Amino acid sequence: MKLLIVLTCISLCSCICTVVQRCASNKPHVLEDPCKVQH
């Protein structure tokens, strides 16, 4: 059960990292101040 949770977290993290990298390449300021971009 724990293994499933860990695998899910890893897949989510990798997915989020991919999205963040794409956003960062398009908008460099996203990494600098993500809060302003989200709100």
Swiss-Prot record:
Pfam family, one: bCoV_NS8
Keywords of this entry: Signal
Keyword Plastid attributed: no
Signal recorded as keyword: yes
Highest taxon of source: Viruses
Signal sequence, start to end: 1-15
Location of the SARS ORF8 Ig-like domain: 16-39
Record-given protein name: ORF8a protein
Organism annotation: Severe acute respiratory syndrome coronavirus (SARS-CoV)
